[in-house]
Curated annotation (Swiss-Prot):
InterPro entries referenced in this protein's UniProt entry, alphabetically: CHR_Transporter, Chromate_transpt
Cellular compartment(s): Cell membrane
A molecular-function term among this protein's GO annotations: chromate transmembrane transporter activity
Principal location class: membrane
GO CC annotation: plasma membrane
Family assignment from sequence similarity: Belongs to the chromate ion transporter (CHR) (TC 2.A.51) family.
Membrane-spanning intervals of the chain: 1-21, 47-67, 75-95, 117-137, 158-178
Protein name: Uncharacterized transporter YwrA
Length: 178
C-alpha cells in the first residue's frame, strides 16, 4: 500500500507544482509531513536544506530521499518515477498547446494568474520552516542568520549552497555552546 501512496503523493505534487521543483515543494510538504507523516517538519526542513546544497533538481532529490525512507529501494524508484513522469508528460503536452496558442489572452492569463498562488504556497512553507527555526534557536539567532543570508545573496550574489554550508557549520560549532 505504501507504494501506491508514494506514487500518488509525488505524482500529484509534481503534476500540480506549476513552476518547477521549488513550486512543488509546498505540495510535497503537505503530502510528506501533514498527510502521510513520512517525515516530521524538522526532518523535512533538514532534508530540504541539504537537497538545496547538493547539485541537481530539488524535486527528484526530495522524492528519492522520502521514497527510500518510507519504502526502501522500491519506494525510491516509485517516488522518482512519480516525480519525473508528470513533468515530462506535462512539458510535452503543454508546450505544444502554448506554442500553438501563445498569443491567446486565455493562455497568457492562465500562466500569469497562477504565479501569485505559487508565491503564497512558498510563503506558507517558509513561515512553517521559519517558525521551527525560531523555536529551536530563538528570535535573535534566526534574525541574524536571516539578515546575513539575505545580504549575502542579494548584495554579494553568494550561492545559496555556501550559505547552507555556513549555517550547518555555525549550527554545529557555535549554537551548542551558546
Amino acid at each position: 500500500m505504501i507504494s501506491i501512496y508514494l506514487f500518488m503523493a509525488f505524482f500529484i505534487a509534481n503534476l500540480l507544482g506549476y513552476g518547477g521543483g521549488p513550486a512543488s515543494i509546498p505540495l510535497m510538504f503537505e503530502e510528506v509531513v501533514n498527510r502521510y507523516s513520512w517525515l516530521s517538519n524538522d526532518q523535512f526542513s533538514n532534508m530540504l536544506a541539504l537537497a538545496n546544497a547538493l547539485p541537481g533538481p530539488i524535486a527528484t532529490k526530495i522524492a528519492a530521499y522520502v521514497g527510500y525512507s518510507a519504502g526502501g529501494w522500491p519506494g525510491f524508484l516509485i517516488a522518482l518515477i512519480a516525480t519525473v513522469v508528470p513533468s515530462a508528460l506535462a512539458l510535452i503536452v503543454l508546450l505544444r498547446i502554448i506554442q500553438r496558442f501563445r498569443q491567446s489572452p486565455v493562455i497568457k492569463g492562465m500562466t500569469l494568474s497562477v504565479q501569485p498562488v505559487i508565491a503564497v504556497m512558498m510563503l506558507i512553507l517558509t513561515w512553517q520552516i521559519g517558525a521551527d527555526g525560531i523555536k529551536a534557536i530563538g528570535w535573535v539567532q534566526s534574525i541574524v542568520i536571516t539578515g546575513i543570508s539575505l545580504l549575502a545573496m542579494t548584495k554579494f550574489k553568494m550561492h545559496p549552497a555556501f550559505l547552507i554550508i555556513a549555517a550547518f557549520l555555525y549550527g554545529g560549532l557555535v549554537i551548542p555552546y551558546l
